[in-house]
Amino acid sequence: MTALRIGNGYDIHRLVGDRPLILGGVTIAHHLGLDGHSDADVLTHALMDALLGALSLGDIGHYFPPSDARWQGADSLKLLAQVHQLILERGWRINNLDNVIVAEQPKLKPHIQAMKENLAKVLTIDPDLIGIKATTNERLGPTGREEGIAAYSVALLIKEG
């Protein structure tokens, strides 16, 4: 029997001035960026939580607490590489990933392929195993009011051997 594990992740960060907007490791031209202790890449953060959750390893706050100065301004793709290593060490590999980014602005479709390629490179998987969609919240809630950007992720892992 094939062993499978599934994990879900979610993250949201406030939009502020004087910060870059980074999603999936892609810096996107926009007048606002995401506020956070690290680079505030909500897509990569949600994905890390999904991967950790699939193996009951807690969440990114456990591994990269905002109270720790080492993670100030950290590149989330480098943190993702560390999370990926935890999965590999336990004998699991990624079967596929599915992600949704919720943002009113900017339009993200032109950047999705680059996000997939960045994540795939770090995770050493084919970009076709990573789904990324962008949607709006139809002007409802904090993302709809353009106060922040959120991301949801699902990770399906398969046991090696």
Swiss-Prot record:
<comment type="similarity">
    <text>Belongs to the IspF family.</text>
</comment>
<keyword id="KW-0414">Isoprene biosynthesis</keyword>
<keyword id="KW-0479">Metal-binding</keyword>
<dbReference type="InterPro" id="IPR003526">
    <property type="entry name" value="MECDP_synthase"/>
</dbReference>
<comment type="subunit">
    <text>Homotrimer.</text>
</comment>
<comment type="function">
    <text>Involved in the biosynthesis of isopentenyl diphosphate (IPP) and dimethylallyl diphosphate (DMAPP), two major building blocks of isoprenoid compounds. Catalyzes the conversion of 4-diphosphocytidyl-2-C-methyl-D-erythritol 2-phosphate (CDP-ME2P) to 2-C-methyl-D-erythritol 2,4-cyclodiphosphate (ME-CPP) with a corresponding release of cytidine 5-monophosphate (CMP).</text>
</comment>
<feature type="site" description="Transition state stabilizer">
    <location>
        <position position="136"/>
    </location>
</feature>
<dbReference type="Pfam" id="PF02542">
    <property type="entry name" value="YgbB"/>
</dbReference>
<feature type="binding site">
    <location>
        <position position="11"/>
    </location>
    <ligand>
        <name>a divalent metal cation</name>
    </ligand>
</feature>
<feature type="binding site">
    <location>
        <position position="13"/>
    </location>
    <ligand>
        <name>a divalent metal cation</name>
    </ligand>
</feature>
<dbReference type="GO" id="GO:0008685">
    <property type="term" value="F:2-C-methyl-D-erythritol 2,4-cyclodiphosphate synthase activity"/>
</dbReference>
<dbReference type="GO" id="GO:0019288">
    <property type="term" value="P:isopentenyl diphosphate biosynthetic process, methylerythritol 4-phosphate pathway"/>
</dbReference>
<feature type="binding site">
    <location>
        <begin position="11"/>
        <end position="13"/>
    </location>
    <ligand>
        <name>4-CDP-2-C-methyl-D-erythritol 2-phosphate</name>
    </ligand>
</feature>
<dbReference type="InterPro" id="IPR036571">
    <property type="entry name" value="MECDP_synthase_sf"/>
</dbReference>
<dbReference type="GO" id="GO:0046872">
    <property type="term" value="F:metal ion binding"/>
</dbReference>
<feature type="site" description="Transition state stabilizer">
    <location>
        <position position="37"/>
    </location>
</feature>
<protein>
    <recommendedName>
        <fullName>2-C-methyl-D-erythritol 2,4-cyclodiphosphate synthase</fullName>
        <ecNumber>4.6.1.12</ecNumber>
    </recommendedName>
</protein>
<feature type="binding site">
    <location>
        <begin position="37"/>
        <end position="38"/>
    </location>
    <ligand>
        <name>4-CDP-2-C-methyl-D-erythritol 2-phosphate</name>
    </ligand>
</feature>
<comment type="pathway">
    <text>Isoprenoid biosynthesis; isopentenyl diphosphate biosynthesis via DXP pathway; isopentenyl diphosphate from 1-deoxy-D-xylulose 5-phosphate: step 4/6.</text>
</comment>
<keyword id="KW-0456">Lyase</keyword>
<dbReference type="InterPro" id="IPR020555">
    <property type="entry name" value="MECDP_synthase_CS"/>
</dbReference>
<dbReference type="GO" id="GO:0016114">
    <property type="term" value="P:terpenoid biosynthetic process"/>
</dbReference>
<feature type="binding site">
    <location>
        <position position="45"/>
    </location>
    <ligand>
        <name>a divalent metal cation</name>
    </ligand>
</feature>
<feature type="binding site">
    <location>
        <position position="145"/>
    </location>
    <ligand>
        <name>4-CDP-2-C-methyl-D-erythritol 2-phosphate</name>
    </ligand>
</feature>
<feature type="binding site">
    <location>
        <begin position="59"/>
        <end position="61"/>
    </location>
    <ligand>
        <name>4-CDP-2-C-methyl-D-erythritol 2-phosphate</name>
    </ligand>
</feature>
<feature type="binding site">
    <location>
        <begin position="135"/>
        <end position="138"/>
    </location>
    <ligand>
        <name>4-CDP-2-C-methyl-D-erythritol 2-phosphate</name>
    </ligand>
</feature>
